[in-house]
């Protein structure tokens, strides 16, 4: 038997913080690829520390629903799961964006744990960001390949340089594809700042995609106000919104995109999980849902 455990931060203050985790778990559960699918959180129940005791399978794939390699993925989660012999070097990620997986024993439950790198640094996240950009303009009769820029927004922090590396990594990969005329990485807490997003683009239209797992205070309040979409998030704002001679198409957190379930699956597959055609089925289902939503908006 094999199980999948999706671990995420959660929040005592924002009940919507855990919604993407449960949604993606449900999507994967429906494929039947795993005998068990569980969710666990740092700030909600079920907690990291208890989740392995709820699993019957001997082989457990743990996928962190986090954006970057850092304190939570390298220290907190392995500690709370009681992974014997864990060392960050097991991930073989010297550049901060290349974590793969490590297979270890969980000391008190006699299970083999395949501990995966965070979803946010997986190559497939570039596809999710692009898909998110498509979603905000869907049904609006626009062509993203014509005079559109893409801003990928990260939190950023001087305390963990890896926080920014994931943002730059995906911005660079998307830029190389030539899908958008311009692609820039911007941040909340370091330069270049999202407050000045219009200064970094020549394109008239800019799609702004926050590389956050869930919608919350940052994505719903801080970023819209920082960019000048509105003076007060409670009054709402237009999409697109006119700011400094540009049209800003703001998408909200990328982690709510249905295709994120694909990234979770791919992390597990990279660690050795046998999922049959589940990856292809999830991709097909999420894109079909997108097509239906776009048609409904026409």
Region roles according to the model:
Residues 1-298:
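Extended amphipathic ligand-handling, pore-lining, and cofactor/metal-binding catalytic surfaces
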């Amino acid at each position: 038997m094999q199980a999948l455990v999706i671990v995420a931060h959660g929040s005592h203050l924002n009940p919507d913080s855990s919604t993407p985790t449960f949604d993606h778990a449900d999507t994967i559960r429906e494929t039947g690829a795993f005998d068990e699918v569980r969710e666990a959180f740092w700030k909600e129940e079920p907690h990291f520390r208890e989740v392995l005791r709820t699993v019957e399978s001997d082989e457990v794939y743990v996928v962190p629903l986090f954006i970057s390699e850092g304190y939570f993925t390298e220290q907190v989660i392995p500690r709370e799961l009681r992974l014997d012999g864990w060392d960050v070097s097991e991930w073989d990620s010297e550049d901060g964006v290349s974590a793969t997986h490590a297979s270890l024993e969980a000391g008190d439950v006699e299970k083999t744990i395949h501990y995966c790198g965070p979803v946010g640094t997986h190559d497939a996240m570039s596809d999710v960001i692009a898909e998110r950009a498509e979603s905000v303009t869907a049904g609006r009769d626009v062509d993203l390949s014509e005079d559109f820029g893409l801003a990928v927004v990260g939190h950023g922090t001087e305390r963990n340089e890896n926080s920014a590396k994931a943002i730059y990594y995906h911005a660079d990969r998307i830029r190389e594809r030539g899908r958008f005329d311009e692609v820039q990485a911007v941040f909340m807490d370091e330069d270049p700042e999202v407050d000045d997003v219009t200064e970094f683009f020549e394109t008239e239209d800019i799609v702004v995609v926050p590389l956050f797992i869930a919608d919350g205070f940052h994505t719903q309040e801080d970023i819209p106000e920082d960019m000048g979409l509105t003076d007060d998030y409670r009054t709402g704002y237009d999409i697109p919104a006119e700011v400094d001679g540009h049209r800003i198409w703001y998408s909200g957190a990328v982690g709510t995109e249905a295709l994120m379930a694909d990234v979770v699956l791919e992390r597990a597959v990279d660690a050795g999980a046998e999922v049959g055609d589940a990856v292809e089925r999830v991709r097909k289902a999420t894109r079909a849902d997108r097509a239906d939503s776009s048609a409904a908006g026409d």
